[in-house]
Amino acid sequence: MSEEIAKLTTVQNYRLVDLIGDFAGEELFLIDGDSLIFHILAKDSQFLAKNGVQILYAIYLLEKELARFKSARLNFCIVFFKNWEALYSQYDGILHASLLLFRRVAIRHLRKHVPVYVFKSLGDSQWSIFIAKHRPYGFMVLDSNQNTKEGGLVISDEQVMVFKSFIFFALSDGVPVALLGSYQFVDNKILVCILPSFFTRSSESVENASNLISDYLKKFGKPRQSIELPDIAVDACPSNASRIQTLSAAWLLLNEKSDLNVDLCKILIILTCMLEELSLNDRFQPAFPLYEDPAIQKFIISYLNATNTILQLLDSKVDGFHDIFDGRLFIRLVVDAALGEFCIPDICRESALSLWKLILDIAPDAGDLFDFPSLSSISKDLCVPIETPVSEIDISLTAYNDPVISPYYDTEEWNLEQREEPGIETVLDFSKLRINDKTMTSKRFDDLSATRKTGDNTKDRKQANKVRRQDQFFISHIQKYASSLTGAKGGQLKRQTIFTQGPNSTKESKQAVKEETSVKNSPKGKNTKNGKAEKEKPGKKSKAPKLSKAEQIRAEIAARKVEKEENKNEVIWNETKNDLGRIKDLNLRAGRLAQLLNTRTYDPYIENEMRLYRIRVLLSLWTACCVTDEGKEKNIKIAVEIFREISIVYPNPITKQVKAALDETLTALGFENVIRKMKKLESKPLSFPFVLPDLEDEEFDLEVPYTSPTFQLLHFGEYMERSMGSAPDSRVAFDPDEWQRETLDILDRDESVFVVAPTSSGKTFISFYAMEKVLRDNDDGVVIYVAPTKALVNQLSAEVYARFNKHYPHAGQTVWSVYTRDYRINNPTNCQVLITVPHVLQSMLLQPALANAWCPKIRRIIFDEIHCIGQMEDGLVEEQLLLLAPCPIVALSATVGNPQEFQVWLSALQRAHSYPIHLIVHEHRYSDLRKFVYGGAKEFNGLQEEGDLGQIAFIHPAAAMSFSDGSTTNLAFEPRDCLQLYYAMKLVSKGDFKISRKLDPDRYFEDIPFIKKVDAVGYEKKIKATIDTWASLPNAFAPNSPFQALIKHFCSEPQKVVNSQLELHNSAYSLDAISQNLLPMLKDLHSKELLPAICFNYDRQECEYLAEIVFKTLVEKEREWRENSEEWKEKMREYKKWQSTANQRAKQMEKFEKSATEKQKEQALKEAGDISWIEFFDPEEPSPEFSFAGAKSTYGKEELYRDLEALRRRQAVPEWYVDALYRGIGIHHSGLNRRYRQIVEVLFRCGQLTVVIATRTLSLGINMPCRTVVFLGDSLQLNALNFHQAAGRAGRRGFDLLGHVGFLGVPLHKIYRLLTTKLWDIQGQFPLTTSLVLQLSQLISGSQAGPFARDTIHALMDEPKFMANGSILSNQVNHHLRFVIEYLRREGLLDVYGNPINLASLTMHLYYTEPSNYAFMNLLKAGVFHKIAEKFATEKFEAMRDTVVILCHLFGRIRMNEQYVMTLEGSTDLAQSTVVLPPLPTEIADVLDAHDQRVLDLYKTYAWYYQKHGNIGVAANKLPLSNTTIEGSAKLPSSLSVGVMSEFCGLAGYNESMVGTTSSFLDKVPDGIFLKTSRLPIFEANKAPYNAYLLDFFTHGSVDMLIEQNNLKQSEIWFVLNDFSLVLATICSCLGNLLNLVTDEDIENAMSALEGSNAVQATTESEATGADWMQNMNGNYSTTLASPELEEKMDMNLFKVYCMFLEVRNQFDAKFRKMWA
């Protein structure tokens, strides 16, 4: 069992995820307290043993770790198990005693500040109740003992197995586990490796794990510290809990009355008082050899054990033990007493004497407190202090005179001591390198390939033609993509030509604008200002304006047109009635009418008549259903349709005759209470008789079996009128809601806006209105749309193309441009709407060449899906963009948990540019979402089967309340949910669990004839308030309470589905079970008209696997059906017969065409109608019974064939992917070919595809409206954020009035948690990276400190709150910036005036790899690669392998689990793979270590300056989490200085000279000093084992081996390899620029200078960076220089390095291309 547990809980690679942003959100996480203690002490435990017993310092470290969790907003609690004390019994002496005391003090102390729970064991019933009530989202447990640092606590394998067994316990119980061994804290994010829970909960496995833990704890034995205290000692306990030492000393005196014991007890009493009165800064004492004396050690152990026992006896509420003992100060006092130099502050002396009196009452012969006769015999050698190393901090700074940044720093204050200009030790000859060329340093990597010139005009023309063809093809593709897009109401987008309205517009533009304005001034748009109706002033009559002759003529013509249109509508309606009368099938007649009403706009009177006519038809259908009550219930949808038509017509202006007909219908339905009186109705006879159908049997009636309110809530919720203050507005082509009009007003004022509104609520129009406004203002302004994904970029480019057209006076200017890393269409600096991604926009804003010319033109930046700022990878860049934005912004999101807080931060940013930002929050979706769970399906045999194959159980939101402590805050209720909840509460209510009669629907809605959505929302709030009251009652969670009965009632149906699934499969959640249920579920959705559907699975391979299963099952079932179906066989016989007579028919038709009359031809066409299906029949096409292809697809058949076969010829995807498209099934994830993905999007919108299986790529704003969303299987990525994003695709506005969200293979507890989890807060990162500072310096330098550069720096430096929702103040940022500049100066990347120099360009172009870019720069400077290049000619592969090993340590690192690495030792299964990356050679690691040491020295200076300027802002004597102050002001002359370290670290004897690494130093600086490890360019080489996947791929090129041996996921391989390929391309490109290799001819000349017999392959730079992976050129050269002129001109040693890198890239990319080709 233990071996199985070890295997299941030991991961190979630590794949880190953002614990909060990507997983837990605000859900409760349970932290094992003992795991946390061991994790902290594994770094350093000397302060609990050899370095003195420092309980306060241990508490400080514990609080500091927990404070990090708090700052990251982790919702956590800590649990301890009493029997786990046995874990500490493996240790001896002082360490054992201090560990146990620390554990007990920690529990007691933390309980006051964070939730801490203590249970007897895992078998404790209270533990089970706790888990059942709180349902933690995950556990955090220690998993490894390999992170122990030198001096840290040694953790045995047996102890680790206890923790691993606990991990197994949690996983078996369905709870994921975060592994503490992988934990990192980056900025304010917790990065950790998470083990997903097992698919099926196993009570047997849970019990086995619990028993195994008990067995291990028994092996460890019981704690060896328990003692018995005399009653007198307990009685003598002082009321002041902080003086517990008094009681301990009394026990020690009574237990063993030796002279030494008596004197040490006196010291203990004095120590007690000194801990209360002494300042924390004066407690840094040197260490003494006396501490190791056995007698002293024995006394301390006895004291610690006594104290631990006494703490057990005290009330748990008594606090104040965090500073219970100071071992170093205790020894100091003993030494002073032994030397006769005992001197303590007077205040301590007085309080000590009062305590000593209590002792004398117990032990009268104890003597004088300040007399220590036995201590005088202590050897003087033991009293000599151990020397504490002290080092001076270099406080000098280099000169810095940047014209923009320097003014922010006071010269006298900062230049305390001038540092000499830094000298750079390097093998590079900078005099021969192109380092000061502004055009070169200002180039971003995205544009580097464009700087290469071939020197051949023919090649230039060919390349230009190729680019032109690509652009034309892209435009053609955009046109097709755009034609599939639809607007908010489901109609195709209409392209409008924009005319400039500004002062510089042309005469033609002004005339066009005037005409356009007159068109807009229709009755709908008149008398409005900013969307609000203008009121006429009272007492004044508006005069009709005097019209000119021409205007009178135009008015008459318009009136005649209106009259003609009205007459035309009447004619059409009369013809339509005649056509409808010929349709015998009433269902078809009603459907035809609905179609007519949806396709065009009619005169209001005629529309009323059409709807009344449809009511008459529906009443006939309803009559046929009313012969039984079952018939009414079964066909209630007909009554819903009748009521829907009435609800549309009734509020409109109607005639007496129409109202009479409606009232008669309402009376027949039993809804008399809906009828309302109306005055002054016009009279106009109906054009048809309206008579209610007669019932054959008088026993029956047409009444609906519900009251009107009940009927509307239960069945009419999706049809309720749902506008939220809608009103006409001339600015847009629809009636915007109130919040939308408010947004338009803000945009018109050129102010910023942050909009948070659910998916499908109508956010999209904001972006397009902002674009249109900029387009209309002038021809120069630019609006930028920033999309988080390239898929969204593609869609937006098509949508902008479909919406806007504009003619420009100058050639080359375009409306829009797309610019991503992959491609660019149109000129991004010569367009008005730029659509891009964060990295590219950041690149453009920081380009000096654009700073003065293009950046000032930016009028607005639109950030869609702004919540992505919280993501670990791209969020940092997006946060930097918000800081850099020089204009008003639009920020849009549907999923922000803290909009008010985030808006405050955005306001601060925009305030620097004088742009106010407004928050718009809209809480309600346009369409409700109905959730269901599916399972227990039978075998699929075709879509024609009747009945359901599986079970669908709809999930009532109340079922999820057990996972939210009964809160309904985050639950959304449909109207029918509210109704069901009311009656269920009424059923179980009793005692305190009451429900008001006012909530009875018939009473609540009695005065509301037609319930609107806003009315239902009000009712929802009140019903939720009642259930929240129930949940807050003391006995709400008791097993038999009404509240629990209510939850069980709603949980029963979904549980039945899960149970039925378990009866058919061993697991309801396995991939096999999902694959067997998926096709039956799709069939059932098809029969219920709930397609199209998007099925989300968060694993790419599983998406493809499930799609393949569906497709192949359809094909196989179709084959079986065709073989056995007589219907199909008969159809084939007819088809073959028809084919055999094709020639004969053709001849007859030709003869008939020549001789027949027109009448004969018409008759022939009618007779041929019955067999026309044969003409379109193709036996090769999928049968409709086995295809999900939409019957109403707008994609032409020939066009579909052409496009899909073109896709097949490109071999972009496997053939079955294309065949599946024919059957209406698609796949969508970011790893697929872009052309395939886009055709999937187009076909889905056009209705050809009705099933798409996708990852989260489709959840971020992609316009693919669907009726149903289904989640296939559980995943760590299926969190609240992704759930809300994906579920929002269902029921999109303009398409469906109700969306459906299904779950297949997702555990019920996970479903309920998703429904109740609050969207978490946006957590930003600290965006001022070292590379960004370097880029800003380049911006200032390259733009000659232009206005844009100055404004950018001003916004950064003057911003009071710098990090999203953080607390970084401006002075902290200024300090950080100055020392980043100091680092860049010392590393030779900036000169004294802030200009980038030397290797700055290379470092900047690798900015996305920070801090690895600085490590690479240092290795290049130090000649590491030069040395390897020396053997490149003779030992080519070895040289390349050495290079790749170094690069693998720098880029794309995946940390491995040390325990797993140990299992690989001696393995014979890894012959072709290295798996574990070899450590860097010592001489290379030394280069990186020397760099880290320079950084450490620099930031010691930083800490000194920070403290000197008094900007810490946090009291040095406060604990970081509890804010507990260590009181005291008394001084002690013998204390040492802690320097820049935290005063708490001084307790353990640390100062700045005693820390060896930067990360260790950062852990020990005062809490108020702003220093972030993640933002310092430290590397820490050979820190941990890393996966050698890049080296292995370079060696064997096998993807399968990467999966099998390196344990990489197939879905991530392409991306990590592509990232490394990009790094190689960047390095090669930058080295080529440094060498001034501008043209291919330059490279060839350089290579020809290297001649010899040793052949070495190389690749020209233009080819290496080509987008189409051109054929590589081979060149032969040796290391012998042949041209002295070239040697003088070029750094030939660096050129050898360049050639080596080109070859490394060549060989890596060759394998990489083979992998993805």
From Swiss-Prot:
The keyword Translocase does not apply. Residues 1160-1334 form the Helicase C-terminal domain. Residues 507-518 have a biased composition (Basic and acidic residues). It holds the Pfam family DEAD. Gene3D superfamilies: P-loop containing nucleotide triphosphate hydrolases. The keyword Cytoplasm applies. A motif (DEAH box) lies at residues 864-867. Its EC number is 3.6.4.-. ATP binds at residues 757-764. It comes from the Eukaryota. Belongs to the helicase family. SKI2 subfamily. This is Uncharacterized helicase C694.02. The lineage of its organism: Eukaryota, Fungi, Dikarya, Ascomycota, Taphrinomycotina.
